[in-house]
Amino acid sequence: MKMRLWKSVLKYAGAVIFFLVVAYGFVPQVLGGKIVNQSDISGYVGMAQEANSWDREHPDDKTAWTNSMFGGMPTTMITGNSKGDLTQKIYNAFLFGKRPAPYLFISLVGAFLLMLSLGVNWILAIGGAIAVTFCSYNLQIIQVGHNTKMMALAWLPWALAALIFTYKSALKKDAGWKTWLSLSTLGAALFGMAVNFQIKANHIQITYYLAIIIFCYVIGLFIWLIIDAERRKTIGRFFAASFLLLFLGLAGIGSNANKLIPTYEYSRHTMRGGSELSADGADGDKKTKGLDLDYATAWSYGWEELPNLMIPNYNGGSSSGGVNPDKSHTINTLRQYGQGNLKDVAKSLPMYWGPQPFTAGPMYMGAVTVFLFLLGLFLCKGMQRWWLLAATLIAVFLGVGRHFMPFTEFWYYNMPFYSKFRTVSMALVILQFTLPMLGFYALDRILKGKYTAEQFRIPACIALALTAGFCLLLVIFPGIAGDFASSSDSQMPGELVNALREDRRMLLSNDALMSMIMVLITWFLIFWACSKPKSSDDAKAASRSRIAAISICIVLSLNMFTIGKRYLNADHFVRPREFNGQFAQRPVDKMILEDPELGYRTVDLSVNIFNDSHPSYWHRNIGGYSPVKLQRYQDLIDRHLGGEINTLIKKINSAGTMTALMEDFPSLPVMSMLNTKYIILGGDSAPIINPQAMGQAWFVDNAVFAASAEEEIGLLDDIDLSTTAVFGPDSGADEAGIPARNPEAIDIQNDVIYMTSYAPNELHYHYEASSDRLAVFSEIFYPSDWKMSIDGQETGPEIWRADWTLRSAVLPAGSHDIKMRFEPRSYSLSSNISMASSALLLLLLLASAGLFYFTSRKSR
């Protein structure tokens, strides 16, 4: 008994060590001190610099607001809130090591456990783990820096494994109530912890897809139980296990309340919450709830590119794909044109010719995995086939988005939270789990002798024809895939377009041949294992099955690693010094930072203003990059800032000299109300100073009340914002409370207001007013959580929204000091919920482990 236990321990410990070797072996550059040159992490470093610097210097007063992007915004989706969560340190411990190797390791172990929960042999479970982890999409998102998404995907199989383990323990035949209850409680506690970690990764869209998979499994299991009289006897256990999973799952969710509640509160005011403005600029009750449907479905997988689940270059692969420079028609053509650096050019060519705007690569699931999935679909009976097929079909229908609008619109308008998500093609990540789950479940049953060669033969031939047969057709007749033309080809010379099409054709044929060979080898190995003579003894049969299992895992691994290296390889790694060099202070940054004035902002015309956060590293920036910026600021960009910037650029280009520009400086009312003082043209040239910048705050003499949101934002162009404030119907302003200007007051021209101290979460001003005055602050308005006090009093004037997106308040006469501080109420409430939930989760996990230990000892 003990010997068998030790063998099991060594076997599974060996698998974990193997996964560690694989994780670091795939990215050996990290052992040499290199890091992945991730574009999204570059963006994060820029946007988070102000908040992170402040938090390091003020650990007891961490900021929940930054002014580094879009004039100012909460840090909810940048740095977040981890206060109160007792499991955060455990989560961080799993990430110990040289990233991204820990991401791969966590995914490998989780997928291994998932395969084991299905009853798959441990050798095949290793292959299944590799199939799940090394899907090309995972490597693409690591390369660009979608680390939160990768971590959410890495923890997803842990949650599924715990879920399946819990139900299987509860429904186990002949198990006494103490045994099944202790096992189910332990499984539910592990499920709660896995859900906790999966949500903690902070990618709610992936969590949403996890919920879809769980829903399909639970409904499938319930139907499977009730359709059979014998199985219906265990329905009570099903509900007991479901209650445990629900309770501990909620504890796992509650542990992340410190992130979820602020995120929910913030999302209502962002692009995910919708706009008050109509698309055509007309008045009316046309406020959208969530993202615009066209925007949300812009990245929709085409029906015609679904074969790249099995053939990576079916639609060209990547919008910046690589080719062999010695065999490429495109490179030969460019060589004739005298193009230099051809080896570098060959690494990044527009090879993709599918329906999406652009893409980093295909959702390649593996030719072997797709073949095994189809084999399982035709061979397996019972629940596993149907619930996995249901989850797969839902994922495909969601992933194709605008190409299946009835289904997409139903989800968009009826399913909770779905309208908050973009990039609908992401739903295909569900296939990263459902395809290997059914495929390796089927393979395991075949190699365990659950099916005879006769039972296997017809389903295997059908699966072979659909995969290897389809690949063979593409090798012989690649033109059946299409004309190899991309919408971007029209911008290129005809000769170059023809060369690109030939390269795309070649890439397709090569990958189709590769996939065909992989499938044929897999089919042969399975057929060989199933075709053992009847006279064979059990030992020889087991040996044959083991050889087939190991061989298939090796074939799959070689295929997944080879394709994976297209999207994450040595070229994507750099030294930390090289990565940080992109944030080096430029001469123009140094010139601007020498200005002692507080509160000014910049706009950098040398970058993509609203899609680049590098300038935010050094400055309070009116640009930046965020898919969850405040919706009112996005409205400001769409209706005013974009146009003003275009006008400014045209004027700069036509002026010729700085003197001519300043003599005929364009009107920039919205940029000026944002106190955009410096206009950056390039890193080495002096910035332009905006003579119209309105300063940190100013008193206004008049107020205009708009009847609608459309009128409110339209008035910003029509009035003098330095003397008049614009209030909308929901601005919170009290028209009767606004002081009337006294035309006889001779001291009004001496009234003054200015900033005296700046911190991202706390602003101080001093003002002198001869009478009660309405002041406008060049700071972005955010409902509720910014509070104002005067002269140290606990309460102060109410902050109103003015000029579409700025703050304003009525200030009493006299000489006074103002403090404006950002303290989100959701942070303190959510931190308390997180602490209570995480404490409960840890206690229940320990208690369930103890219960299982004592129950198992007594049973022995």
Role assignments for model-derived ranges:
Residues Q49-N81, D85, G302, Y314, ...:
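Extracytoplasmic/lumenal acceptor-recognition loop(s) of multi-pass membrane glycoenzymes
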Residues M3, I130, V144-A154, T166-A170, ...:
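Contiguous transmembrane helix-bundle modules in multi-pass membrane proteins
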Residues M115-F134, D174-T185:
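Transmembrane-helix signature of polytopic, membrane-embedded enzymes
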Residues G25-G43, A257-T270, F404, F477-S486, ...:
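Helix-to-loop transition at the C-terminal end of transmembrane segments
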Residues P102-G119, T369-L372, L438:
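Transmembrane-helix motifs of polytopic, lipid-linked glycan transferases
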Residues F19-L108, I130-I142, H146-A154, K286-M365, ...:
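Membrane-interface coil-to-helix junctions
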